[in-house]
Amino acid sequence: MAILSSQKQPLEPEPSKNPQSVQQPGLPPSTPEQGLLTAEVSPEERLSRTDDIRPQRLADYVGQKELKEVLQIAIQAAQSRREPLDHLLLYGPPGLGKTTISLILAAEMGVSCKVTSAPALERPRDIVGLLVNLKPGDVLFIDEIHRLARMTEELLYPAMEDFRLDITIGKGQSARTRSLPLPPFTLVGATTRVGSLTSPLRDRFGLIQRLRFYEPEELSQIILRTASLLKTELTPSAALEIARRSRGTPRIANRLLKRVRDFAEVKAAGTITETIASEALQLFNVDPCGLDWTDRRLLTVMIEHYGGGPVGLETIAAATGEEAQTIEEVYEPYLLQIGYLNRTPRGRVATLAAWKHLGYTPPDGQLSLL
């Protein structure tokens, strides 16, 4: 989300008129690997089965230590009272395991989990069909819950609070409301935009938990486990090499592992060493900091054309040919996380770390902005 200021905004800074003031190593020509480092589910992943590599129990789930402790207490308390779990809202960047957690909760409670997403619930009857078919204690997982239609969301209010479905029959003065009892269930909502949820919906969740990015050591454990399930030989140092470039995201880590596995099977008789992993990821344009071709291009344009910034989002979008929303939602979060980009009231600024990573030397006048 762009940072706004109540003060009058200055005009966009003009492109640097003194290109000699920046030492320019340039961006090597390359064809970016489309979608390899995005945390969104790829079409290939939608078609393939991922259940085989998902952890089935909370004890097998790597990372998110505080979240696991909270959920373990909630599970044990619910089991002792023979009640369903409280409704749970999970928020955070995509690819961190929200769907996996909902499936684990259902497995721990010994119930079924129904998985859907808000865009699939276009009409009120879609959510009604799901709710009336739930069994006592079942888990209903709704991904991208911030995108629920208004009428669908309003149907969830009594369902979540009183396990009741209120259906309006007829129109105008002849309209009447009929209430249908629902079995007690647990709603698990997932969102990347918790601020976009309405207060009435957010307030009906008994547990609200944030998922954080993973440390390289945690991702390394996930990669080693996945490699074992895929019957792939992988050294611990190779797993850590892949983990460092995975943007703190398990989905990306598993995706990179599969691409490295393909490379190793063709080029190195199937065994993945640190050297093989590094060569494969270099081929796929994933650098040691987890930046891909597009990430580096965004920073390079800011540095070469605008002296590192500040520069507006729309200007960056026009200069790179990317949509402003794509830059803001897909590329910027990781650049902000690793400290390569700053958002200021005047625009985006490439940090000193970004200059050094790309091999540039900032001019003296720019150091005050970094």
From Swiss-Prot:
Region annotation Small ATPAse domain (RuvB-S): where it falls in the sequence: 215-285
Entry annotated with the keyword Membrane: no
Gene3D superfamilies the record matches: 1.10.8.60, P-loop containing nucleotide triphosphate hydrolases (3.40.50.300), Winged helix-like DNA-binding domain superfamily/Winged helix DNA-binding domain (1.10.10.10)
InterPro entries listed in its UniProt record: AAA+_ATPase (IPR003593), AAA_lid_4 (IPR041445), DNA_helicase_Holl-junc_RuvB (IPR004605), P-loop_NTPase (IPR027417), RuvB-like_N (IPR008824), RuvB_C (IPR008823), WH-like_DNA-bd_sf (IPR036388), WH_DNA-bd_sf (IPR036390)
Region ranges (Disordered): 1-53
Superkingdom in the source lineage: Bacteria
Binding annotation for ATP: 53-54, 95, 98-100, 161-163, 204, 214, 251
Region (Head domain (RuvB-H)): 288-370
Bias type Basic and acidic residues, positions: 43-53
E.C. numbers: 3.6.4.-
KW Cytoplasm (keyword) present: yes
CDD domains: AAA (cd00009)
GO cellular component, one term: Holliday junction resolvase complex
Region (Large ATPase domain (RuvB-L)): 13-214
Coiled-coil stretches: none
Residue numbers binding DNA: 343, 348
Binding site for Mg(2+): 99
Subcellular localization, as worded in the UniProt entry: Cytoplasm
Keyword annotations: ATP-binding, Cytoplasm, DNA damage, DNA recombination, DNA repair, DNA-binding, Hydrolase, Nucleotide-binding
GO biological process, one term: DNA recombination
Family: Belongs to the RuvB family.
UniProt xrefs under NCBIfam families: PRK00080.1, ruvB
Subunit description: Homohexamer. Forms an RuvA(8)-RuvB(12)-Holliday junction (HJ) complex. HJ DNA is sandwiched between 2 RuvA tetramers; dsDNA enters through RuvA and exits via RuvB. An RuvB hexamer assembles on each DNA strand where it exits the tetramer. Each RuvB hexamer is contacted by two RuvA subunits (via domain III) on 2 adjacent RuvB subunits; this complex drives branch migration. In the full resolvosome a probable DNA-RuvA(4)-RuvB(12)-RuvC(2) complex forms which resolves the HJ.
Function: The RuvA-RuvB-RuvC complex processes Holliday junction (HJ) DNA during genetic recombination and DNA repair, while the RuvA-RuvB complex plays an important role in the rescue of blocked DNA replication forks via replication fork reversal (RFR). RuvA specifically binds to HJ cruciform DNA, conferring on it an open structure. The RuvB hexamer acts as an ATP-dependent pump, pulling dsDNA into and through the RuvAB complex. RuvB forms 2 homohexamers on either side of HJ DNA bound by 1 or 2 RuvA tetramers; 4 subunits per hexamer contact DNA at a time.
Comment text on domains: Has 3 domains, the large (RuvB-L) and small ATPase (RuvB-S) domains and the C-terminal head (RuvB-H) domain. The head domain binds DNA, while the ATPase domains jointly bind ATP, ADP or are empty depending on the state of the subunit in the translocation cycle. During a single DNA translocation step the structure of each domain remains the same, but their relative positions change.
Designated name of the protein: Holliday junction branch migration complex subunit RuvB
